[in-house]
Every structure is written in structure tokens, then in C-alpha cells.
Amino acid sequence: MTNFYKVFLAVFILVCCNISHAAVSFIGSTENDVGPSQGSYSSTHAMDNLPFVYNTGHNIGYQNANVWRISGGFCVGLDGKVDLPVVGSLDGQSIYGLTEEVGLLIWMGDTNYSRGTAMSGNSWENVFSGWCVGNYVSTQGLSVHVRPVILKRNSSAQYSVQKTSIGSIRMRPYNGSSAGSVQTTVNFSLNPFTLNDTVTSCRLLTPSAVNVSLAAISAGQLPSSGDEVVAGTTSLKLQCDAGVTVWATLTDATTPSNRSDILTLTGASTATGVGLRIYKNTDSTPLKFGPDSPVKGNENQWQLSTGTETSPSVRLYVKYVNTGEGINPGTVNGISTFTFSYQ
């Protein structure tokens, strides 16, 4: 009987000591390059369709399924951080600056590109909520991918980007797991690449300076405040590359801050109590004035054409308007500039 108990005890101790414990080890590289070396990417877009994102898919990326070896119930998630300056945003995602002309959209996450988190700001953020391995050995990976963004209005050009540090991903143990002295952070640098950027736009066919002769009228034709009479008309014509949608902004040259629909008369005008409004085509609502800028979404910008028109034109009607301050006859002069945006 004594020998039986000794054998039983020995077997019990052997089984006990084979129970696994949560463990992690680093098997990746601390410094990693994103994208192919000397990559080259080409695209065509309208001049003012900015910011313009190059659809490179996942070609500019880094993906590694074997960065940490984990076992025995170890629980791990991932945090990511971008070190580049934020220069704008697109649909809630930060645009990070590389050069004056080129920026980046960045995604970080686990091994699967499609689950990457769109990065915003420069703080650590959760890019993979995590999981707990069972009583077996597995690995935790990660991925980073980017898309270049054209930031500024320019003619067709080639942009070269040098190798640039992007940021980092760190392993985040949780649920009682501990990394101890194991390497938890890996860094990423974007490999150099070239963008071959082709832009499309339009050419103005009518003179850049248009003089509209205003008809002479009597004060009796504008008896009440808000009354209008057609004073003159003109047309603007363009020749456009295929696919370009033209937008335009009128700016009050005398009072550039004017955002109303009444053009300020110049100092050379002698009439008072009268203003000028500008209408396009058959619209019943006058155009409002905005900043002298081709930026997409400029204040009081209006659509002149669709992307299917290669020879767009617009008819503009200038109307006198009684401003309600009492009309005194005289000369009427106004200056408005027009700025086109090719989107």
C-alpha cells in the first residue's frame, strides 16, 4: 500500500507542473518600412478637386502576422500613434503632412488591412480591441497602410517624397496579462515614392475682362424698395477637359468682404439709392458674392456646369435694384470679378 501512494503522488505532481502560463515574446522587428521602395503612382483629377486621394489600394503598406508570440491565455490588443503633423481632415480622418503638396491618410490595426483604424490626431488610440489566446501558442500581428493625398492647387507635376517616419504601434496586454520586459512598441517609416499627378481644367474663351453697358432708366421704373429692372447682360464661355465640373464665385471688387446679393457701386458712381444684382441663366434668385478663391466649397460658390459638358457657358443678367434709400439720378458703376473652380 505504501508504494501505491508514492506512485499516485508522483503522477499528480507531473500533471500539475505541465499546466501552461500566460506568456509573450517579441519575434518581429522594431523598425519597419511601409510600402515598396521607390514606389511610383499615377492619377488624373480636376485641378480643384482637393484634397485628392490616390486610390492605391493596399499597395503602400506593411503587414506582418508574426510580431509577438503569445500563449497560455495571454490577452493582447494594439494601440497606434501617428507622429506626422495634422494638416487637414477628410470625412473625420486626419490628413497628415509630408510636403507642402502631398499628405497622407493612415490606417493602423491588426494583420487584416480591411480592419485597420482610420487614424486621427497625434495621441495613442486603440486600433485593435484585442483577444485572449487559449492554452496553445499563437501570434499577434499588425498592419499599417497609407494613401497619398494631393493638398494644393497646381498644374500637372511629379512629386517626390523622401523616406519619412510615420509613427508606432504598441502591444497592449490586458485582463491581467503582463509583457514584463518584452519589446512592446514597433516603429514605421514610409519608403520613398513618386506621384505622377495629372490635372484637368478649363480655358476661358470669352475675354477675361468683360464690360457690360448698363441701360439708362428713369427713377420711375424703380418706384419701391426691392424693385428691379434689367440693365444689361453678358455670357461666359469655357472649353474644358472631359470630366471637369465647373463652379464659380463672384466677388465684389469694391467691397471684397461683401456676402450679400447687391454689388457695391464704385466711387465713380454718382447715383444713390440704387444697386446692382446679378442673375444666371433663368434663375429667379440673385447670385451672392464670395471670397476670391477657387477652393472647393468656397462661400457662395455656384455650379456652372456638370462633368459631362466640355463647352459650358452661362448667361449673366445685371439688374438695377431699388435699395430703399431714396433714388438720386446719376451714373452707376460696379466691378465684380469671377473665379472658376475646376472640380
From Swiss-Prot:
Disulfide bonding pattern of the chain: C75-C132
Could you tell me one molecular function GO term of this UniProt entry? carbohydrate binding
Composition-biased stretches, type Polar residues, lie in 298-307
**Chain segments carrying region Receptor-binding lectin domain:** 23-199
Which portions of the sequence form the region Disordered?
Answer: 287-307
Organism for this UniProt entry: Escherichia coli
Report any one BP term from Gene Ontology: cell adhesion involved in single-species biofilm formation
Key words, A-Z? Disulfide bond, Fimbrium, Lectin, Signal, Virulence
Report the superkingdom from the record.
Answer: Bacteria
Name it.
Answer: F17f-G fimbrial adhesin
The entry sums up its family as follows: Belongs to the fimbrial protein family.
Entry-linked InterPro entries: Adhesion_dom_fimbrial (IPR000259), Adhesion_dom_fimbrial_sf (IPR036937), Adhesion_dom_sf (IPR008966), Bact_Fimbrial_Adh_Pro (IPR050263), Fimbrial_adhesin_lectin_dom (IPR015303)
**Name of encoding gene:** f17fG
Region listing for Fimbrillin-binding domain, in residue ranges: 200-343
The organism's lineage is: Bacteria, Pseudomonadati, Pseudomonadota, Gammaproteobacteria, Enterobacterales
Q: What does this protein do?
A: Essential fimbrial adhesion factor that mediates binding to N-acetylglucosamine-containing receptors in the host intestinal microvilli, leading to colonization of the intestinal tissue, and diarrhea or septicemia. Also confers adhesiveness to laminin and basement membranes.
Signal sequence region: 1-22
Entry's localization field: Fimbrium
